[in-house]
Amino acid sequence: MSHKFRFSKESRERLKNFLLGDWYKTKGDAPAQETENPQPQAEAVSAAQGENAPAKAPGKSIAVVSRTDIGKMRKTNQDALIESTELRLYGVADGMGGHNGGETASAGARDGLLELLEGKEPEQGALRTAIGAVNRRLFLQQKGDEQLSGMGTTLTVLWLSDKCVYIGHVGDSRAYRLRDGELKQMTDDHSVVAELLRSGMLTPEQAATHPMRNVITRAVGTEDGIEIDLMCEERRAGDVWLVCSDGLYGMVGDEKIAEILKSYKPKKAADLLIAAALEGGGRDNISLVILLDKEGEQ
């Protein structure tokens, strides 16, 4: 995500006010992209890729597959996959920042979260505390190193207990759930364009090529404090979960993602999703984790 930017809350409000003015009104024919669902309570397949065999946790079975690809236009892969069958923790961090800042931030988020959650039972409080601590670490690290100035990362993770999927989310990576054939976006994008969409100031057609579409409004490590979205969703047998960076959903629409997840087992689906993102342009790093819940609540 080397071309992502992060806006402060104050800058975001100034931007909204600006866009409500006459300048924005002249842009009504700006082209197009995707909607965001409201949230309740391959050139080559994989330059680097990982895959876990079905993971057996106490009383619960989960099939897990992950993939990451540098894409067609980036020189480095600043995404990090988060996978621990022992913790039942899975997710994606999509880094940003010059020099090695993006890679440092995403790897730091991954490693810090795995360290801080080791031995913990899944619950929202522990997840909130761990993400907050990771944020503080990365913030202090970039403040102490000029070359890392401005670095940060998105972070979207699933942490599974026997009955619940706890979701922790900051930024514009996404968590989706496929249940009973219906794909649902479980997280809200923390981005300028997503906020404008939610407020009705942009149409989906205007959003796709909006000049601010790569500006995120929250990231891990960019400020001393952080606002984290936390959710708890009931596990159900047959659910398919997808966590991905914007390098996937920015190139592949939700309808196509749903079609692939419904039609193929996780391993094949992961390969096809990477291939579709590359075929769609591969403009960013592409990372994803797919979970098939075999033994959630019946």
Q: Locations of the language-model features?
A:
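PP2C/PPM-type serine/threonine phosphatase catalytic domain
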Residues: 1-298
